[in-house]
Amino acid sequence: VSEWGHNSAKTVHLMTEAERRVYADRAVYLGDPDFFKVPIAQLTNDLYVKERMSNFNPSKATPSMEVREGILLAAESEQTTHLSIVDQQGNAVSVTTTLNDSYGSRVVVAGSGFLLNNEMDDFTSKVGSPNMFGLVQGPQNAIAPGKRMLSSMTPTIFLENGSAALMLGTPGGSTIFTSIYQV
């Protein structure tokens, strides 16, 4: 921008296109921070900004119908942890554990000091209604005695000739599948 000069046609065009995208994000991601968690870190992330400007054309305006809010980058989960360990004898473990939401169920086990999760949210409580992460699931995932909820956790160990060759897993809730798929 500095080489284009202040208020040059190129600079004004770039600023206008950036402002249009910011305004589209404003309508969806901004609000009173006392009532709404504003995703400041995600909105100001360099990768997010680069993605927002990926359809920028320096020679013409982006059609207004194409200027929508951006898709926020998945934030690193504060509630889900994955670890993979191999010892000297080749014993391997791949573990993913989660609270699901901040502070899980908000219930601490007396005398133990750890929180219980709220994985019940991963069941379908009402068909057609989203859970806390916006996922809508069908009746096949309805709550039932002894039933396990649908989960995206995929701690994985690949074996080669009977020995652990690759172990992987990741936090990320509903984005776990796409992260694992890329490996």
Model segments located where?
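Structural recognition of the beta-strand scaffold that forms the well-ordered cores
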Residues: 84-85, 93-95, 115-117, 156-159, ...
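Extracytoplasmic/secreted cell-surface and envelope-processing proteins
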Residues: 104-105, 125-126, 176-178
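Alpha-helical support elements that line or immediately flank enzyme active sites
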Residues: 170-183
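Cysteine/selenocysteine-centered motifs that mediate thiol-based redox chemistry or coordinate metal-sulfur cofactors
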Residues: 120-166
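Short, solvent-exposed loop/turn segments at the edges of secondary structure
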Residues: 78, 109-111, 138, 150-154, ...
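Internal maturation/activation junctions in enzymes
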Residues: 2-99, 106-112, 119, 126-136
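Extended C-terminal subregions enriched in glycine
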Residues: 89, 126, 147, 180-181
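A short acidic/small-residue loop/turn micro-motif
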Residues: 100-102, 172-173
